[in-house]
């Protein structure tokens, strides 16, 4: 795909192809059909991020085949919900692939690094049991070109742990808060910071947590204004949303997050 795009851009530069025609061509679908999948090679051109492989429900051979085709385009490969039995085959097939077994996620960096987001994405977990979802978010955010920091096991059962790290909260551009049980931590964080807070309910908890539904409802009903909520255990979705925010900051120029934060503080 990269070679075809480069050839088209050269034709535009030489005047052989009008800009409007080139734009129309680049907007057309560019897919590759396998017996079990239709790979979207133009996803990166449309959305800025290549297609991501969701491994759950797929056989190991299917995941590897899709990954090989994406890797051949030099766009990088991100695979979520990787089962334990697929970790070693991925390492054998792809030199340089990073497999995070705790987060059940694998990442093969592209030939060229992705554009950098402005500022740091901080991932806060209520408890150690929330780490698998948090690691999915961390690897995803890194793969999308972001600086990532972690703040682990600072839930409301010992709120002093969080309050002793307000420096980390204050320096973040976007904060992802991952919590199960009662799901109260995002509201606490949302009441302390002026930056976007993305809440991720997890399925961690005893019976009446209903597999994360209790945490989800708590987060949806947060009294901290502006807390955004994604689906249960969806660390990937939270990181994707956070990355769009940081890349939006970057697109607005060098004024950066610090000036935005100062403006919010001055008006509060």
Locate the predicted segments by residue.
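C-terminal binding/interaction regions
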Residues: 125, 166-170, 204-268
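Glycine-rich phosphate/diphosphate-binding loop of Rossmann-like nucleotide-binding domains
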Residues: 117-160
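Short, acidic/small-residue loops that bind anionic groups at enzyme active sites
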Residues: 98-100, 189-212, 267-268
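Glycine-rich oxoanion-binding loops at beta->alpha junctions
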Residues: 105-111, 147-168, 213-214, 230
